[in-house]
Amino acid sequence: MREIITLSFGQTAGHINADYFNSQEHYFPLATKSTSDPTVRFRRGVATDSRTETYNPRLLTWELKGGYGAFQAFNQFYTEGDKSQPQVWNEGEIKEIKEQPVDKNEYQKALDLGRENASQLNTDTTKRWTDYNRLFHHPKTRHQLDNWLFDPDTAPQGIHRGGDQKWTGFDVGVNEWEHVLNSDKEYLDSTLRSWVEECDSLGGLNVVVDDSAWAGVAAKILANYRDDFDAKGTVVTWSVEAKPEKKTRETQKNAIQTTVALSQVSSIYIPVSFPTKTPIDADFDPTSPWHQAALFGLSVYEPVQLMATQRTGGLSLDAMAALLDTTGERNIVSEVGGTLTDVDGDKSTVQYDSRLFQELFLPSRIPPKTPHVFSDLSIARLEDQDDDANSYRLNQPMPEVSSQPEFTKQFVSSKTRLAVTTKPRRTLLDMAKFVSVYERGDEREEMKQELGDMASKYEHGWEEESDDDDDY
């Protein structure tokens, strides 16, 4: 068995993973009919009654204070002081965090009674991912930064509890991580290490983060993981860019720091942008994180995740990384998309290509060329696969869970594609120019050189040497 542990940082990541793990619950009753092995993503456990077998996601979540909403660390299967699995959790007592309670929505109340109803969910009642989470989590999956507050209405970006500083910017996350380590030198030993060591054969880490201050936290945790636990293990990182905002020097600097730091600690780095317009029908609301996560899950995220859990004909995380990064030096995925087919045979294509590769940092007189594709991966779910070596077929049926929006019910099959292309080259060179023009300090020259070296890995053909309007 090649277990996969998912690390989820913040609300955007929480929505994506709540949708995914809810969907996986649908496959449990299918038993032998399911093509997916649940033990890759779920861990077996025993409830406090010493009789009931439980399955908990191999998932670690990080949130700001208030981010968990009504989601409780302890539940009917795990109570405070639970020592039912001492062979796994041997890093001290579980700490319960007290905070102002948030009332459960009607869907969660109905779930507690075993009477959930999809009509109880809408875009107003799903502002936190915990509003529609269906699964019990082990108490040690949950981690919280108490110095920062989240509220979907009054502080959607997150705010420092001592003032007006927002939870934005790579450096803000780095500073908070240093504060965490200063308070607890063994933080990673008591969080991530326990999960890694319980695995029979760790298949890798699946990481989801956005480009807020969480990027700084995630980059530091992964760097420490590389240094202390597993220097060569597979790490696949999905980085979701925030909603479009006015381009400033700060947002550009943040994009540079996020791209460099996360790509360096990842085997495969997949930056994505959620679309503001899609061909999906009017029931889809692009402003709803619940809707965006469900659409992304159906078209891209779940098919990719399912490949690593297939009993036969699948693709492990390390095999996927080797397929996409054929040289060991080009690990940035720059084309991400999916096509969904509905019951009438109509197709809707949604692209998640990062805005990094669509909007130049600095003005250029030369229009972008058609990108060269170095490698790609395509997954056909209940459809005919493409006729090439990097195409895979997925026979797992589409999920049917009450927690998903109504618009998802129309789709019966999908095709997903990830590709490594020449697109990052131009963006990385633009980043180097930005550093040259605007940055000062001792790290300026080192950062320029680093970005230039990264860009050179995405060159293709003799013409690449002359398509820049000036040197960086």
From Swiss-Prot:
- Where in the cell is the protein located? Mitochondrion
Listed disulfide bonds for this chain? none
**SUPFAM superfamilies the UniProt entry points to:** Tubulin nucleotide-binding domain-like
Annotated region Disordered: the residues are 441-472
Q: Kindly state which keywords UniProt assigns to this record, in alphabetical order.
A: Mitochondrion
User: Gene3D superfamilies attached here?
Assistant: Tubulin/FtsZ, GTPase domain (3.40.50.1440)
Say where the protein is mainly found: mitochondrion
**What cellular component terms from Gene Ontology apply here?**
cytoplasm; mitochondrion
Composition-biased stretches (Basic and acidic residues): 441-463
A biological process term (GO) from this entry: mitochondrion organization
Q: Which Pfam families match?
A: Misat_Tub_SegII, Tubulin_3
User: Origin, by domain of life?
Assistant: Eukaryota
Functionally, this protein is described as follows: Involved in the partitioning of the mitochondrial organelle and mitochondrial DNA (mtDNA) inheritance.
Family, as annotated: Belongs to the misato family.
Q: What is this protein called?
A: Protein DML1
Source lineage: Eukaryota, Fungi, Dikarya, Ascomycota, Saccharomycotina
